[in-house]
Amino acid sequence: MIKVTRLNGQPFTLNALFIEQIECFPDTTITLSNGKKFVVKEDEEAVLEKIAAFYRKIQIFAMDQGIEEPE
């Protein structure tokens, strides 16, 4: 889950696993896999950072250990 802020200043928590698309035109709009849209104050880069941190937290995004696979 990631915490984001509506344009009216109200914070809310969103399940990042259901995010399908993030657009900026000019406000950041998050579209979920069910088609529901949320317009938030955070810019696209901030939302992407929150998603990556969430994925690392739940271990979907493994941290690079610097281990190279043999060719």
Swiss-Prot record:
GO terms for biological process: bacterial-type flagellum-dependent swarming motility. InterPro entries: SwrD-like. Disruption phenotype: Mutation abolishes swarming motility, reduces swimming speed and torque of tethered flagella. It does not affect flagellar assembly, flagellar number or surfactant production. It comes from the Bacteria. Required for swarming motility. Increases flagellar power, probably via the flagellar stator components MotA and MotB. This is Swarming motility protein SwrD.
